[in-house]
């Protein structure tokens, strides 16, 4: 790399002078550890096709195929989140069972991407790395923000850490799904129980596994106690600017885009919806 720029002390690094499509296996391994440590890593001026993006994800493990998101034909897991992409790019996409095309759901702060969240927390093994590549970027606005849940945990007192360690919480899916055992019962949210504090398998660092949208209650506490503790933890994450990074996407030359790759397990993210019509 020509340059490695740490955007903040706790979270966010930009790599200059490398093409993701040309990384050696050793570089891919080093990048994986860097993402685990820095939470999110950015690459501008990337010549990256959907196939090359998919291949990089496939190197790291099984690619998550979202059941409700459109994907590039032949590349399950190469999700498209821009509802005009098929028209603009001429790609053949699968839009079956898709609600991402309804941008009211994105703009609405209660259910959309402009509220802090972690993806797929309801799964037995929540998604590891997420790779977002943008080929079209508005002239202004559309920033994306990340929180380091490592740093959020580190802000807690030792006594409070002891209180939280071993506690489990209930996590709910962002979307509703049909139960194949009861298809006539209608779509329902999926709930899963996970530890509230977890340890990253690569770094060995503890992190706080909460987000305001999908962490609903702590087991073993009364509803009032659970709400009080969770709201405090949400505030620790959301109100401490020193554990956050805000990334500004910038236009590059035609045919090139910008990539962000983050560790979904140890982070929260949100967009800033100020670019409608741009």
Task: Go through each PLM region and give its residues.
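Fe(II)/2-oxoglutarate oxygenase catalytic core
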Residues: 2-261, 265-278
């Amino acid at each position: 790399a020509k340059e490695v720029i740490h955007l903040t002390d706790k979270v966010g690094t930009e790599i200059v002078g490398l093409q993701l499509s040309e990384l050696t296996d050793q570089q891919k391994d080093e990048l994986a550890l860097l993402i685990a440590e820095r939470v999110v890593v950015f690459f501008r001026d990337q010549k990256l096709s959907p196939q090359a993006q998919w291949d990089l994800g496939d190197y790291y493990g099984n690619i998550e195929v979202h059941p409700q998101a459109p994907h590039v034909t032949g590349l399950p897991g190469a999700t498209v989140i821009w509802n005009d992409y098929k028209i603009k790019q001429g790609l053949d996409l699968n839009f079956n069972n898709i609600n991402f095309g309804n941008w009211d759901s994105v703009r609405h702060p209660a259910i959309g991407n402009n509220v802090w969240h972690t993806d797929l927390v309801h799964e037995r093994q929540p998604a590891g790395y997420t790779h977002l590549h943008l080929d079209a970027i508005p002239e202004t606005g559309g920033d994306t923000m990340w929180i380091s849940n490592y740093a959020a945990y580190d802000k807690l007192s030792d006594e409070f850490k002891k209180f939280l360690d071993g506690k489990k919480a209930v996590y709910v899916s962002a979307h509703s799904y049909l139960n194949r055992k009861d298809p006539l019962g209608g779509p329902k949210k999926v709930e899963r129980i996970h530890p509230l504090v977890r340890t990253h398998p690569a770094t060995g660092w503890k992190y706080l596994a909460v987000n305001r949208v999908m962490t609903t209650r702590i087991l073993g506490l009364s509803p009032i106690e659970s709400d009080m503790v969770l709201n405090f933890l949400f505030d620790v994450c959301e109100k401490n600017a020193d554990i956050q990074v805000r990334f500004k996407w910038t236009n590059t030359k035609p045919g090139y885009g910008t990539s962000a790759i983050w560790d979904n397990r140890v982070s929260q993210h949100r967009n800033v919806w100020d670019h409608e019509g741009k």
